Amino acid sequence: MATLFIADLHLCAEEPAITAGFLRFLAGEARKADALYILGDLFEAWIGDDDPNPLHHQMAAAIKAVSDSGVPCYFIHGNRDFLLGKRFARESGMTLLPEEKVLELYGRRVLIMHGDTLCTDDAGYQAFRAKVHKPWLQTLFLALPLFVRKRIAARMRANSKEANSSKSLAIMDVNQNAVVSAMEKHQVQWLIHGHTHRPAVHELIANQQTAFRVVLGAWHTEGSMVKVTADDVELIHFPF
């Protein structure tokens, strides 16, 4: 058996091929797993569990079917869907996890997270993240009418796209010291995350031993998952 990890699908109505590919994944590979972990940015945007978007309900039903089949499903918030709440979690049968979670998998101690907190060189983003994660601000935003939230979210995405276009690729990648610090804090040899859209397996030194950072790819033109078994940790890309 295997435990599966995915991230950065950025599901939206404008990308039906990705949605179709995810549905096939849920109906196939996911049903064979010991567990499925979604490490953030499942959706391109999330403005509240009360959003009647048909795509959200379609995805909730599909994930719930996996959960009901006996495969537990877990979710860590990303930078796009950090407002996804308990209502959607119940509807989809997912368990919400904290932003950093340590798993014991087949004899390995593995830290999982979305990955944006590791990009500490991007000071502008980290300041923005700290602001929008304030509970009082989230409560205020979610109390606004849905049409107002949609306008704010659209403007924020446009501003983010403009800001990122002028940033260097290095700034938007993880900071190596932040990686080592997180792994040593949790005393792990393995780290699995998404966010950067730079799929790879990196070898490093943490806790005075060889350690590994596995980065999930985004679902742009193909699927990406990490498959952990008793024998191996594999980064796998597959057609939709």
From Swiss-Prot:
Q: Which GO terms describe its molecular function?
A: manganese ion binding; UDP-2,3-diacylglucosamine hydrolase activity
**Membrane association type:** Peripheral membrane protein
Where does the chain bind Mn(2+) 1?
8, 10, 41, 197
Q: What is its main location?
A: membrane
- Provide the GO biological process annotations: lipid A biosynthetic process
Q: How is the cofactor bound?
A: Binds 2 Mn(2+) ions per subunit in a binuclear metal center.
What Enzyme Commission number(s) does the record list for this chain? 3.6.1.54
Q: Where in the cell is it found?
A: Cell inner membrane
One Pfam annotation reads: Metallophos
Q: Which reaction does it catalyse?
A: UDP-2-N,3-O-bis[(3R)-3-hydroxytetradecanoyl]-alpha-D-glucosamine + H2O = 2-N,3-O-bis[(3R)-3-hydroxytetradecanoyl]-alpha-D-glucosaminyl 1-phosphate + UMP + 2 H(+)
Q: Copy the pathway line from the protein's UniProt record.
A: Glycolipid biosynthesis; lipid IV(A) biosynthesis; lipid IV(A) from (3R)-3-hydroxytetradecanoyl-[acyl-carrier-protein] and UDP-N-acetyl-alpha-D-glucosamine: step 4/6
Residues at which substrate binds: 79-80, 122, 160, 164, 167, 195
Q: Where does Mn(2+) 2 bind?
A: 41, 79, 114, 195
List all disulphide bridges recorded for this chain.
none
The cellular component terms of Gene Ontology attached to this UniProt record, alphabetical and capped at eight, are: cytoplasm; extrinsic component of plasma membrane
| Swiss-Prot/TrEMBL keywords | Cell inner membrane, Cell membrane, Hydrolase, Lipid A biosynthesis, Lipid biosynthesis, Lipid metabolism, Manganese, Membrane, Metal-binding
What's the cofactor? Mn(2+)
Q: What does this protein do?
A: Hydrolyzes the pyrophosphate bond of UDP-2,3-diacylglucosamine to yield 2,3-diacylglucosamine 1-phosphate (lipid X) and UMP by catalyzing the attack of water at the alpha-P atom. Involved in the biosynthesis of lipid A, a phosphorylated glycolipid that anchors the lipopolysaccharide to the outer membrane of the cell.
Q: Which family does it belong to?
A: Belongs to the LpxH family.
Q: What is this protein called?
A: UDP-2,3-diacylglucosamine hydrolase
What is the scientific name of the source organism? Escherichia coli O6:H1 (strain CFT073 / ATCC 700928 / UPEC)
Q: Which gene encodes it?
A: lpxH
